[in-house]
Amino acid sequence: ERGCPRILKQCKQDSDCPGECICMAHGFCG
């Protein structure tokens, strides 16, 4: 499992997201 905290965080780009999360198409980290 990758190091992505399970929090709902809005984003515009991957760097907006914590840990190893990426910015998904719906505009939230995942």
UniProtKB/Swiss-Prot annotation:
Site-annotated residues for Reactive bond: 6-7
- Where found? Secreted
Question: Which species does this protein come from?
Answer: Momordica charantia
Show the disulfide pairing. 4-21, 11-23, 17-29
Similarity section: Belongs to the protease inhibitor I7 (squash-type serine protease inhibitor) family.
* Principal subcellular localization: secreted
Q: Does the keyword 4Fe-4S apply?
A: no
One Pfam entry for this protein is Squash
Q: Which UniProt keywords apply?
A: Disulfide bond, Knottin, Protease inhibitor, Secreted, Serine protease inhibitor
Task: Please report the name of this protein according to its UniProt entry.
Answer: Trypsin inhibitor 3
Its biological purpose: Inhibits trypsin.
Q: Give the Gene Ontology MF terms in alphabetical order.
A: serine-type endopeptidase inhibitor activity
Organism's domain of life? Eukaryota
Its UniProt domain note says:
The presence of a 'disulfide through disulfide knot' structurally defines this protein as a knottin.
What's an example GO cellular component term for this entry? extracellular region
